[in-house]
């Protein structure tokens, strides 16, 4: 747990987050700063993805185009890869208003697999609710996202979303989903095989992540806000 989560879940401590950090720095408490999620300085993430090669895909879908929209809320999208012994990946979404994290297992990291998830979600939610949640999506330049038109055009021919891309090597431009991945990797560390991971397993993990209080939500959880 982060210091913020500790203070939120244990009001009997009657101290601020700043005070808790101070106590940890001074060695008054047994935990060390190196044990804390936000104190650790992570190395830049290595990029293992195959990148989109067709540059025409990015016309009017650049990060600068996305910024010009000046949106209050949108969705972020990414994939999390298994260990090398499995081709399965997790397609993830982060809804920035609710801080809500969603995850779906895919058998392959392909454009077609991503489209199948989009179509399934639209079937389950209905076109109107899909449009409400995924009207604008910011993602990276992984090749699995290289056919934006197939993702933008819905099952009934109605435009269901608009896809935009981060600048190269700038994963921090979709920082919400990167933070959610940090929480996901606490449960599914790197080099974990997803070969036998089920959607039910993922639902349990996602429920845990979305039930964690957030400072940015005033101590509420994403489920409280959604």
Question: Language-model segments: what does each one mean?
Answer:
Residues 1-12, 62:
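A short, amphipathic alpha-helix used for macromolecular contacts
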Residues 149-161:
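Short, surface-exposed basic-aromatic patches at helix termini and helix-loop junctions that form
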